[in-house]
A protein has these predicted regions:
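N-terminal leader/auxiliary helical segments
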Residues: 1-205
Length: 205
């Protein structure tokens, strides 16, 4: 799954392409990770369901069944973009970097990849010339899949992501290719825009 800064990169580009001037778009882009402490909370917030082969994937259709009538709201559009991006993370990143590995090597690669996120934060902020959008939690949400206390925590983590570690800024990536990450982000933006345009045509938002 992509990092907070990656999701923010996506919603920043969506805001420009869709002409959305609302912090709620960015808040929605982070919201799926505002989960509770139980084991199933991430599956619920990411609309993850088992496939016929027993493996789990994000079910975008399930999200639209539940919230499709609210897709005029920037928050829900941002939320949807997060799900699209996480869905594509498997196809664009997991298949290349993790699937060929043994379970032991995969665990090692996951740790290295997590450390790469700190380096990627600095690289992406610089590459896209990102500035921090001040986010505030919403008082309440009709989404019972979001933990509002956890959402405040996600916002604080997002704010901390903009505090660049000089060491990380000058460090090379150990696992990911920066070009692959940029390609993944571009694919996520294009796919989200395409799906939102399709929803617009169907519902005439």
């Amino acid at each position: 799954m992509g990092s907070r800064i990656m999701h923010y990169c996506i919603t920043v580009q969506l805001a420009e392409k869709l002409k959305i001037n609302s912090e709620l778009l960015h808040l929605g882009g982070l919201a799926p990770d505002a989960i509770g402490s139980d084991d199933q909370s991430k599956d619920r917030s990411h609309f993850i369901t088992p496939k016929e082969n027993g493996k789990k994937r994000i079910n975008l259709g399930l999200f639209l069944e539940k919230y499709g009538d609210r897709m005029h709201d920037p928050f829900y559009r941002g939320f949807f973009s997060h799900l699209v991006a996480d869905y594509l993370w498997y196809d664009c990143i997991m298949v290349k970097y993790f699937k060929p590995l043994s379970m032991e090597d995969r665990r090692k690669a996951e740790k290295i990849g997590y450390l790469d996120f700190r380096i990627l934060n600095a690289k992406l902020i610089d590459h896209f010339n990102l500035t921090e959008c001040k986010l505030t939690t919403i008082e309440q949400s009709e989404m019972d899949i979001i933990d509002m206390h956890a959402l405040s925590g996600v916002i604080h983590q997002y704010e901390a992501d903009f505090i660049i570690d000089p060491i990380a800024e000058s460090s090379p990536l150990r696992l990911y290719s920066f070009e692959d990450i940029l390609s993944y982000l571009d694919c996520s933006v294009k796919e989200t825009v395409s799906r939102l345009e399709e929803i617009n045509r169907e519902t005439k938002i």
